[in-house]
């Protein structure tokens, strides 16, 4: 996803409020744990992108931020919402550097849930873990991991170890954790 961002002044509350009122989202780009730039993201463009995004996929989405004539590849590290309207009011981006490891959550997608044996026998499919915490290089980031639940019967589970994890991803979460279960109703 490509975003054109503009520079902004530092964090005066009145300035941040004005940015939000004019259709912007205040944001910060971090690199190596240090603040690199204070920026503004177009709220309309970002909200439109969010509405089309699959649930949980934001954490593994790589953004190309067009900032002062250069492209910065980054992940959203933190997002703040307004409590009552659930509008995005602040973003933190983490710059991706090719030779540096990054920690992120990769969403887990259950496939063939409609054909699940346990569900056809009257069971209820419940996904316990929705994302896997991993460490990897930026080139190894995948948008999601798939877990096939077609053969899952009543009272059976699938663990993180049952997911085909690509070679470049190193899981932080223990692989013995249960991802999905089919229980009797």
UniProtKB/Swiss-Prot annotation:
Keyword Ribonucleoprotein found: yes
Keyword terms of this UniProt record: Ribonucleoprotein, Ribosomal protein, RNA-binding, rRNA-binding
Superkingdom of source: Bacteria
A GO cellular component annotation in the UniProt record: cytosolic large ribosomal subunit
Range of residues in the leader sequence: none
InterPro entries referenced in this protein's UniProt entry, alphabetically: Rbsml_bL25/Gln-tRNA_synth_N, Ribosomal_bL25/Gln-tRNA_synth, Ribosomal_bL25_b-dom, Ribosomal_bL25_C, Ribosomal_bL25_long, Ribosomal_L25_dom, Ribosomal_uL5_bac-type
A single GO molecular function term of this UniProt record: 5S rRNA binding
Keyword Ribonucleoprotein: yes
GO terms (BP aspect): translation
UniProt cross-references to HAMAP family, sorted A to Z: Ribosomal_bL25_CTC (MF_01334)
Quaternary structure and interacting proteins, as annotated: Part of the 50S ribosomal subunit; part of the 5S rRNA/L5/L18/L25 subcomplex. Contacts the 5S rRNA. Binds to the 5S rRNA independently of L5 and L18.
Family from the record: Belongs to the bacterial ribosomal protein bL25 family. CTC subfamily.
Function description: This is one of the proteins that binds to the 5S RNA in the ribosome where it forms part of the central protuberance.
Name under which the protein is recorded: Large ribosomal subunit protein bL25
Source organism of the structure: Chlamydia felis (strain Fe/C-56) (Chlamydophila felis)
Taxonomic lineage from the root: Bacteria, Pseudomonadati, Chlamydiota, Chlamydiia, Chlamydiales
Gene: rplY
């Amino acid at each position: 996803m490509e975003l054109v961002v503009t520079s902004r002044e530092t964090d005066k509350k009145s300035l941040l409020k004005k940015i939000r009122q004019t259709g912007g989202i205040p944001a910060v780009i971090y690199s190596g744990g240090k603040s690199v730039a204070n920026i503004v993201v177009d709220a309309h463009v970002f909200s439109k992108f969010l509405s089309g995004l699959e649930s949980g996929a934001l954490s593994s989405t790589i953004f190309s931020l067009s900032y002062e004539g250069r492209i910065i590849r980054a992940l959203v590290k933190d997002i703040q919402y307004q409590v009552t309207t659930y509008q995005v009011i602040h973003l933190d981006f983490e710059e991706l550097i090719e030779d540096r490891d990054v920690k992120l959550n990769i969403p887990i997608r259950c496939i063939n849930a409609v054909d699940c044996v346990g569900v056809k026998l009257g069971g209820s499919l419940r996904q316990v873990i929705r994302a896997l915490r991993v460490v990897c290089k930026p080139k190894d980031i995948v948008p999601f991991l798939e877990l096939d639940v077609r053969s899952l019967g009543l009272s059976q589970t699938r663990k993180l170890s049952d997911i085909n994890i690509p070679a470049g991803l190193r899981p932080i979460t223990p692989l013995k954790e249960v991802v999905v279960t089919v229980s009797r109703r």
